C-alpha cells in the first residue's frame, strides 16, 4: 500500500482556510471564488470553492477558465527552449537577425532622463537576455507619467500595466513602437519585468515561421493534452469562464475587470507571451508536472532535462539582485531563471530552497517543489492589488506545506 502523501485532517484544515477567504466579505478582501490543486508523488487533490460570477452565482468548477496573465511567462520560456534545443536559436546569440527593430539601441543615462539623453548600447540583446528579463526595458513600479520613458511607453500602448488584449497592436507594429524608445538599462545589466516575455513571443513566431498561438498549440499544448489553454476562449467554452474582478480604489467596491465573454473571448491582435493566456487548473497542472518530471510527459519528452534544469536555476548575479526587482527586497530570498522565480532562501512555512514558479497578477499562483515532489496551484478571479502576494495566496502556500506527511 502506498503511503499517504498528505494528512487528511490537515487537508481539511487547508480547505477550511481557503473557504474562509471565499466567505469573507468581498468588499474587505474576500475572494468570489477559487480553484486549488495540490499534488505530491501522484496524489492529487482539487477543490473548487465559491462562484465564478457574482451576478449569476454560477459555481466554480474544476474546469473553470481563468486569465492566467503572468503565468504565461513560464510557458513562453519553455517554448523558446524548444527552439534552442533545435539549434534554431542560441542562448547567447544576438536577436538582431530576428528582431531588427531592436538593433542599435540607445540607452537612457538615468531612468528619469529626457528621452534624448542617451548613450549607445554596449552590446546587442541576446536570447538569454529575453529569457532572464535583462533586455534593458520593462515595467517599473511608478506612476505611468513618473518619468519621460514611462509616459512615452504608455502612450505607445506596448503593455506597461495589467493585461488588456484589446489595447495592443499586432506584433510587427508592437515591436516597431518598442523600437522607437530608448532602453532603461544596458542589455544584461539589470532585471526589468514583463516586456522581455512579450518580445520573446515575437522572437518565437519569427524564428519558427509560425504565429505564437500555433507554435504553442502544436509544440506544447497538444503534446501535453492542454485543451483549455489559448490566447482566447472559443464560443463553445465561454460559459466556463470566470468573471475577473478588481478592487476599485475610488469606490471601495469590487468591480468587473473583464466579464465573461470579454476581451479574452476573441483572438487578440497581439498574442502576449508575457500575460495573454487563458487556462484551467488541470491544463496548467499538466505543464507543471512536465517540468517536475524533468521535461517528460507520459512516454514523450517535451524538453530535455538540461533545458528544464537551466530554466529553473537562478540566473541573476548578486549585483543584478542588488539593483532590485519590482519592489525593494524582492531578491532577498528569490532569484530568477527563464520565466520563473526561484526560491533561494526559505522565509515562510511554504516552498523550500530550489522551488520555482510564478504568479499571475489577475489572481493566480503556481509553485513546483522538486525536493518534496509538490505542485501547488491556486486560481482565483480577483486581481492582486500589489506585486506582493495577497493573504489568500500566502495562506494557500502555508496550508499546502502544513498538510504534508513525512
Where are each of the predicted segments found?
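Acidic helix-start/capping segments at beta-turn-to-alpha-helix junctions
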Residues: 96-104
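Short, conserved catalytic-motif segment at the N-terminal edge
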Residues: 8-68, 88-90, 106-116, 401
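Short, well-ordered beta-strand elements
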Residues: 366-368, 373-382
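Generic C-terminus detector
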Residues: 382-406
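Short loop/turn microsegments at loop-to-beta-strand junctions
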Residues: 32-34, 362-365
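Active-site SXXK
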Residues: 18-22, 41-42, 67-95, 197-205, ...
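Hydrophobic (often cysteine-bearing) scaffold residues that line and stabilize catalytic clefts
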Residues: 10, 14, 18, 68, ...
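Short, surface-exposed loop or secondary-structure junction motifs
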Residues: 46, 106-353
Amino acid at each position: 500500500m502506498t503511503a499517504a502523501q498528505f494528512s487528511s485532517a490537515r487537508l481539511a484544515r487547508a480547505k477550511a482556510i481557503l473557504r474562509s477567504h471565499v466567505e469573507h466579505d468581498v468588499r474587505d478582501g474576500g475572494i468570489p471564488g477559487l480553484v486549488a490543486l495540490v499534488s505530491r508523488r501522484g496524489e492529487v487533490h482539487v477543490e473548487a470553492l465559491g462562484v465564478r460570477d457574482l451576478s449569476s452565482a454560477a459555481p466554480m468548477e474544476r474546469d473553470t477558465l481563468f486569465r492566467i496573465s503572468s503565468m504565461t511567462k513560464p510557458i513562453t520560456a519553455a517554448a523558446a527552449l524548444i527552439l534552442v534545443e533545435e539549434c534554431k536559436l542560441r542562448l547567447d546569440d544576438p536577436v538582431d537577425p530576428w528582431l531588427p527593430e531592436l538593433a542599435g539601441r540607445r540607452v537612457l543615462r538615468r531612468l528619469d532622463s529626457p528621452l534624448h539623453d542617451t548613450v549607445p548600447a554596449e552590446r546587442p540583446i541576446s536570447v538569454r537576455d529575453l529569457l532572464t528579463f535583462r533586455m534593458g526595458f520593462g515595467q517599473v513600479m511608478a506612476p505611468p507619467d513618473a518619468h519621460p520613458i514611462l509616459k512615452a511607453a504608455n502612450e505607445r500602448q506596448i503593455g506597461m500595466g495589467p493585461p488588456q488584449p484589446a489595447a495592443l497592436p499586432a506584433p510587427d507594429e508592437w515591436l516597431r513602437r518598442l523600437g522607437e524608445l530608448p532602453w532603461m538599462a544596458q542589455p544584461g545589466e539589470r532585471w526589468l519585468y514583463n516586456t522581455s516575455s512579450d518580445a520573446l513571443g515575437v522572437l518565437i513566431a519569427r524564428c519558427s515561421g509560425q504565429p505564437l498561438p500555433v507554435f504553442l498549440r502544436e509544440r506544447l499544448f497538444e503534446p501535453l493534452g492542454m485543451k483549455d489553454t489559448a490566447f482566447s476562449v472559443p464560443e463553445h467554452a465561454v460559459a466556463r469562464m470566470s468573471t475577473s474582478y478588481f478592487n476599485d480604489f475610488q469606490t471601495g467596491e469590487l468591480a468587473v475587470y473583464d466579464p465573461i465573454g470579454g476581451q479574452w473571448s476573441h483572438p487578440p491582435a497581439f498574442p502576449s507571451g508575457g500575460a495573454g493566456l487563458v487556462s484551467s487548473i488541470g491544463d496548467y497542472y499538466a505543464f507543471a508536472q512536465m517540468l517536475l518530471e524533468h521535461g517528460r510527459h507520459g512516454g514523450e519528452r517535451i524538453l530535455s532535462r538540461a533545458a528544464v534544469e537551466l530554466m529553473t536555476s537562478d540566473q541573476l548575479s548578486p549585483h543584478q539582485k542588488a539593483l532590485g526587482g519590482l519592489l525593494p527586497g524582492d531578491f532577498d530570498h528569490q532569484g530568477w531563471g527563464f520565466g520563473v522565480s526561484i526560491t533561494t532562501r526559505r522565509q515562510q512555512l511554504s516552498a523550500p530552497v530550489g522551488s520555482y514558479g510564478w504568479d499571475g497578477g489577475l489572481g493566480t499562483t503556481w509553485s513546483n517543489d522538486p525536493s518534496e515532489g509538490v505542485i501547488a496551484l491556486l486560481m482565483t478571479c480577483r486581481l492582486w492589488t500589489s506585486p506582493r502576494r495577497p493573504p489568500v495566496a500566502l495562506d494557500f502556500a502555508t496550508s499546502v506545506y502544513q498538510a504534508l506527511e513525512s
